[in-house]
């Protein structure tokens, strides 16, 4: 096993522990708590994949961080902060909408890279809006936290989420996954729209329905792909 992979996991475990202690003091805001919850799942998946105990890794990560801090000067820290590009966290959904459990009458699921696409194929003739919580950098989508499809009544009928065991995805991965979700939902004559926030940072152009252009043949091809691969 690569030593960098192990040490990276150890540092991530310790930093999560620090953030958890911070949250336990009721000092974290909604985006902070959301990332904390999702990173916990990610660490669990990585730990299982690597065969490493999280508690042991956390202690080792603490030693690594302490050693770095001992060698770090205040001036070097200022330079690092100044040179690092800043990302922003954008939210379409409330914490309740993100954490709400939902159920599917006719479940369909597809894994696309490091993203999992789920939808209820029993939903028909509905007006559906896609909402997402995500971070951006340089005015482009950086990391998808969670995307969900909502009916006008507020029911959740679809979802795109990162796989905890496979971290890392690009904005193109997200756009492709959204295309698959839209194609699957529209197969049952649903009308799908993308939220203005997601539209702005995921695509540079849109049609009058506030959603990315998607040819009919492409929609049908992606919908068939879901049915054939599940």
From Swiss-Prot:
Pfam families with a match to the protein in the record: Flu_NS1
Region described as RNA-binding and homodimerization: 1-73
This protein's record includes keyword Acyltransferase: no
Official protein name in the record: Non-structural protein 1
Function: Inhibits post-transcriptional processing of cellular pre-mRNA, by binding and inhibiting two cellular proteins that are required for the 3'-end processing of cellular pre-mRNAs: the 30 kDa cleavage and polyadenylation specificity factor/CPSF4 and the poly(A)-binding protein 2/PABPN1. In turn, unprocessed 3' end pre-mRNAs accumulate in the host nucleus and are no longer exported to the cytoplasm. Cellular protein synthesis is thereby shut off very early after virus infection.
Protein's organism: Influenza A virus (strain A/Chicken/Brescia/1902 H7N7)
Family: Belongs to the influenza A viruses NS1 family.
A GO biological-process term: symbiont-mediated suppression of host cytoplasmic pattern recognition receptor signaling pathway via inhibition of RIG-I activity
UniProt GO MF annotations: protein serine/threonine kinase inhibitor activity; RNA binding
Complexes and interactors: Homodimer. Interacts with host TRIM25 (via coiled coil); this interaction specifically inhibits TRIM25 multimerization and TRIM25-mediated RIGI CARD ubiquitination. Interacts with human EIF2AK2/PKR, CPSF4, IVNS1ABP and PABPN1.
Location within or outside the cell: Host nucleus; Host cytoplasm
Record's comment on post-translational modification: Upon interferon induction, ISGylated via host HERC5; this results in the impairment of NS1 interaction with RNA targets due to its inability to form homodimers and to interact with host EIF2AK2/PKR.
Motif (Nuclear localization signal): 34-38
PABPN1-binding: region residues: 223-230
Gene: NS
One GO cellular component term noted in the UniProt record for this chain: host cell nucleus
Annotated segments matching region Disordered: 205-230
UniProt entry tagged with the keyword Disulfide bond: no
Record text about domains: The dsRNA-binding region is required for suppression of RNA silencing.
